[in-house]
Amino acid sequence: MADPRDLQLSAYDYELPEARIAQRPVEPRHAAKLLMVPPLEASSLQGRHGTVWDWQNELRSGDLLVVNDTRVLQARLRVRRSGGGLGELLVLEPRGEGRWLCLARPGKKLRPGDQVWLEALEQDPLPLQVLASDPASGGRIVQFPPAFVDAMAIEALLQRYGEVPLPPYITCHDDSDQERYQTRYASRPGAVAAPTAGLHLSDDLLQAIRARGVQMSSVTLHVGLGTFRPVETEDLSELSLHSEWVEVSTQLVEAVQACRQRGGRVIAVGTTSVRALEGAAAAGGGDLQPLKGPVDLVIQPGYQFRVVDGLLTNFHLPKSSLLLLVSALIGRERLLDLYALAIANDYRFYSYGDAMWIAPGAVLMDARPR
């Protein structure tokens, strides 16, 4: 019987000591701690503790690992305001004719009609015009000069002068973030945040996984503005979520079909891979089909998965859509108990934090693909 609390946002809250928010990644990547969720039939919720390197022992020959190959844009530009103060623009998406939707900081001091200059170009500053506010996002529409009408020109500008946009809860920055806040297989620029479960996969671990006969394939989901937005709808039966651009290729669909035929399991690396796979299946009427376009799928308790059997994931923020997604796999109360266990055992949370492994045997019976 469904628990009515599963549809209340307040039921997905938990308290996290500030010291448990990871400020820097561990080295090597695969040295992060790993909490392995016990199977449904287990007599306790204690779980097993290891490292992400140990995760290879949980995988089987014939399994299919699906990763998200998006690459984080160096989308944060430092600007100087007309009064001399500094600000930031997080460049998000094109709005045509050299106009781009940006998140602005400080928002109250970057208003429509203001002009700012790219801070990195001290000798020949590049003027940018704040045209309008965007009520849907809380951002600003910013006009770039004519030389930057083309998206490729903007990408080149960001690559040269931009910075990786780390989440606001990471306050310790250094030059290594440019490499460390990307997965090793990131190849398709377009995200403003990393698919963080993939940050744990080192070259050595990927090689070891392939050596076990595990197949690998990729989807693309460009993590967008919504990743910075908290869920605000208390009644989750009325929840709608931001859309994110997804590409699921014919080759990926064929790889999933081949995995099923050989008796393998589809293992998603990260919630973004889950959303891409399940979104493509939903668009296909329940069957996984190639897809290129936006996905706004809501995954929360009561959802029956169509593609994904298991998940490697990080520990997520309270009341977030990602927490709802993981709860759909293993149950809300069970998830919160496991989070309490992780906190008690000094696991590190969020983007640069540790990981959780949800094996197919740990997934709720009603949620499993049929």
From Swiss-Prot:
Reactions it catalyzes: 7-aminomethyl-7-carbaguanosine(34) in tRNA + S-adenosyl-L-methionine = epoxyqueuosine(34) in tRNA + adenine + L-methionine + 2 H(+)
Record's keyword terms, sorted: Cytoplasm, Queuosine biosynthesis, S-adenosyl-L-methionine, Transferase
Pathway annotation: tRNA modification; tRNA-queuosine biosynthesis
Protein origin, superkingdom: Bacteria
InterPro entries: QueA, QueA_dom1, QueA_dom2, QueA_sf
Annotated Pfam families: Queuosine_synth (PF02547)
GO BP field: queuosine biosynthetic process; tRNA wobble guanine modification
Residue ranges of the TM segments: none
Similarity comment: Belongs to the QueA family.
Protein's job: Transfers and isomerizes the ribose moiety from AdoMet to the 7-aminomethyl group of 7-deazaguanine (preQ1-tRNA) to give epoxyqueuosine (oQ-tRNA).
Assembly notes: Monomer.
Official protein name in the record: S-adenosylmethionine:tRNA ribosyltransferase-isomerase
